[in-house]
UniProtKB/Swiss-Prot annotation:
Species per Swiss-Prot/TrEMBL record: Pseudocercospora fijiensis (strain CIRAD86) (Black leaf streak disease fungus)
Pfam families the record matches: Aldo_ket_red
Enzymatic class: oxidoreductase
Entry superkingdom: Eukaryota
Gene3D superfamilies listed in its UniProt record: NADP-dependent oxidoreductase domain (3.20.20.100)
Catalytic residues (positions): 93
GO function term, MF aspect, one: oxidoreductase activity
Protein's name according to its UniProt entry: Aldo-keto reductase MYCFIDRAFT_87468
Coiled coil stretches, renumbered: none
Conditions for induction: Expression is positively regulated by the cluster-specific transcription factor MYCFIDRAFT_198930 and is up-regulated during banana leaves infection.
Family: Belongs to the aldo/keto reductase family.
Keyword Transmembrane: no
Keyword Magnesium: no
Amino acid sequence: MSPMAIEPAGDPEHGAFDRNDNADAVVRSINETHVTYKRLGKTGLRVSVPILGCMSLGDKHWVPWALEEDKALPLLKGAFDLGLNCWDTANVYSNGKSEEIIGKAIKTYQLPRHKLVLLSKCGGYVGEAPNVKGDRYENAISRSKDYVNQGGLSRSAIFEQVEASLRRLDTTYLDVLQIHRFDPNTPIEETMKALHDLVSIGKVRYLGACSMYTYQFAQMQFVAEKNGWTKFVSMQNHYSLLYREEERDMIRFCNETGVGLIPWAPLASGMLTRPATQKVPEGDRAIINRVQEVAEKRGWRMSYVALSWINKRVSAPVIDFDRIDRIEEALATKDKELTAEEEKYVEELYKAKDVEGIPSQR
C-alpha cells in the first residue's frame, strides 16, 4: 500500500516546519498509517476500520481454530503497528483467555493504553474449565450451583464480570462495554442503571449492545433516556451480503438514532472471500458467484467486494484474523468503492432468511 506522501505544511504564524523537529514525526506517522478511522455512531470516538475481532485468540480447548498465545501476541503487535488499534473481545472468549492475551500484549510490547480502543462484553457465562462454552447450555447453566449469578445482566453479575475483565486485561477501564445479548430474566431498569453507574465511576467510557431484537434494544434505550442514564452508542449485530435480515428494523433504528453499527461476520465466516463450493446453499452460492464475478472484472480479491459493500453501511465491521497478511488484505479495501450498478448486482439475489445469532426467549 503506497504512503500518502504528505509533506510538512507551512504555518501562517511560525513559518515552515523545521524538517528536523517533531512535525516530521507526525508526518511519518500519517504516512505510515494504513487504516481509516470513523466515528462510532454520533459519538466523538473514532474506531479503526476494520475493528480487530479477538474471538479467535485464546485456547484450542475452547475452539479448535483458536490462536494460542505464541501466535496471538505477534498478531496483536502487528495489528497495532499497522494502525489497527480498536480490538473487540469478550469475557467468554476462551473463558477469559482472549482478554488475558490482550493484556499480556499491552504489557509485553509496552503499547500505550491511551492509543488503544478496547471493547469487551458481559452477560455470558465464563467457564471454569477451558473447554466449557456456556452458551451450549442456554438458561440451564443458571441453575448450576457453580454458575448461578455468574452470568446474565443483573447488577451483581455485571459488576463482577467487568471487574474480572479489567483484571484479565490489566487495565483500569474499558473504552466500550457491550452487553453480549438481551437478558429477559433481569429488569431493564436494573441493567441500565448498573451500566450507567460503571460509566459514572470511570470503569467504562461508552456502552454498546450485541445481537438482539430491535424492540428489546429500543426498550433499553428508552429506559436509559427516560431516567437520564447512559445510552448505548453501538450495536454489534450479524450483517453481511449473505445475511441482511437486520436491514428490516435494527439498522434503520440505529441509523435514525445515531447508534454506530459494528457488525460481526461481515465476510460470512470466510464464505465471501473464496469461490463457492457445492456445499454452500444455493441462494448463498448465487450471491458469492456474483461477488466473484465483480472481483474478477475489477482485478480485486473477493474480500474487497464484500468489505467495500459493508464499509459504506456501517461504522466498522469486526473481523478476526489469523495472519498479518490478511489484515493487510482487509486494509487494502481502504480506497476501493463499488459503483451503484455493482452494488445492485451483488444485492439483488438476496432472499429473506430465518433469524440468526439471536437466542430464543424461553
